[in-house]
Amino acid sequence: MTAPASTVIPYFRPAVERALSAAGGLELTAPAQISGVDGQRIGRRSGNALEFSEYREYRPGDDLRRIDWRVYARSEQLMIKQYSEEIDPRCDVILDHSASMAVTERKAAAAIALAVIFTTAAANSGFSLNLWHSADTFRRDPYPADPFRWDFPPFETPFSPSSVPASFAGPFFHRGIRILITDLMGPDDPSSVLSRLADGAKRAVVVMVLDPEELDPAPDSNVMLIDTETGEERELVLDEGTLRRYHERLEHHRAMWASAAATRGVLLLPLSASDYHTEIRPDELFHAGLLK
């Protein structure tokens, strides 16, 4: 699965087209701290986080501590201070390009579709936007809102997102939304990737994508398991006992990540690739409050 520079892998073009069609009218939901009192974006300006940007009229329900009483003394108008983080919401989307993300065509297509949905919804909402490809390092895409021009590395790196932060020199947006699309299928300690993702963010989200064959593998007499990232091979009989132990370990693994995410205020959202493959069904993204 390789791609020429600055183009999406042609094989996944149908997935991109389906995701663009599904996301055409969607918007990314801003956390309450970076939206107006009614949940709507107020405007758009440039500037650094926490930098004063402009005033707006007081509305019932606004925090009274943000009224500028000096302005009121001069004009007898109640005015609220706004800061650049409220005027210019920001979003970083990080796509895991480790080899396990393409263990099936369906899983790879779903991961790409999710990246398209989030970047399109963020652009529709007027967010400043970064798309990061997590391969041997984090690569910032020059065209985050145009999937057909993405500089797309193949899903074949042995690195997982938790292996990258130490070598990652580029900045995430400060006080923005960060969304990591990955499968978390590795032996790594959750603390490093979750701490890096959440540090300085208003909201951090991990979208855990697994293929139906990973969620519920079918029994089989003899199978050869190949680690897509190390090449290690192991022959197994997928009988009832083996599958029971697999499900127990998978549940323990997911619970470990969920606990670590909750401790750090990160939303962990498990998804099935089947909902983002031939048909886009983003219901869980709405239920989680990520899209509107």
Identify the residue ranges that each predicted region occupies.
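Exposed, interaction-prone extracellular/peripheral surfaces
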Residues: M1-R44, R56-R65, V71, E76, ...
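Residues that recognize and position ribonucleotide moieties
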Residues: N48
